[in-house]
């Protein structure tokens, strides 16, 4: 495999799609040595097929606001790869949404889902719509219009969306309700549903919980205990909340959260009351974290900066893609944390990730660390299919086992001759080989 040649061809085909090209290059660099041991892959043009989505659906989403004004947004669904199961991946409603971001997320999702060992392919979708400042009725009308087109290409055995940034329990409810009205059927065609109508226990916390199970295992493998360690978290949304909750439960001290307006430094650490307040911050819809410092005066709000300047043992980017850049990496390396783990999808820029790996720091990629969310979605799909509901303890036990299995796969494929574990390479190779073998078995399709 000639990575540069492949990337040049992709750049010509997809100019300006920076996030997608970044994600593809990271995987290709990781798997090239293994790929080159399989001439049958080259003959079948496996790489050329695996980097392109099977299908991309784009549609307009017209809706009317509370003043009677008509708006038109763009809706997308990227059905990336179905080799190991129906397409599975979230919906994101945010002004930054574009095809490049959704293709990167769908590509990553393909390998992340493979790591869980559950039968799920990769997909992603969403719209450039923002829920910020919109009333419940406006959000409902938008979701209903969005589903009027999306329902044609999804279903429990075809494509199962879930939530993501801007798509929480409220939005999933509106989307599910419209799907049910249009199709005259109740099915497990979405995950992240409410407990009263087919949802799974601990699904809201699952991404954060799974991330901490992975980090805990990573630390233990290298002779460290998470108990008593300080944790810097970015974001204050669903993922950050779950991560803070589980980190505190495991005995660590979470000392930061952040938002677009800056970050909160709380040296005393987040307790149950403060973690629950994160839900109030999110529910306010204002997308700022500063009110935390008003509510808890012992904490400090630092405007316009990221939390990576704070000395910590564990750094967990939990907000969005490429939030931790090369300069942030330099700052973290100076403060010498034990590990950095991407809880957000591709939370570190390529430059930052390269610096962590070059310094032999414990660094784990999002496709492994945050797989707990989609793993629990897979468990929700199973519960819907067998018409049963498992308890918190049953779901948590299964999630724990899945995350430990993902860690073992990363170690198996990522251990270097000098003993260093390259978790990025390990995760990419493990996920890639499962998808590649499935594609080879199914012929040129």
Predicted regions: what is each one?
Residues 2-23, 218, 333-445:
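Adenosine-phosphate binding glycine-rich loop
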Residues 94, 113-227:
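Glycine/serine-rich phosphate-binding loop and adjoining beta1-alpha1 elements at the start
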Residues 1, 15, 19-22, 26, ...:
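Conserved active-site and cofactor/substrate-binding residues in soluble primary-metabolism enzymes
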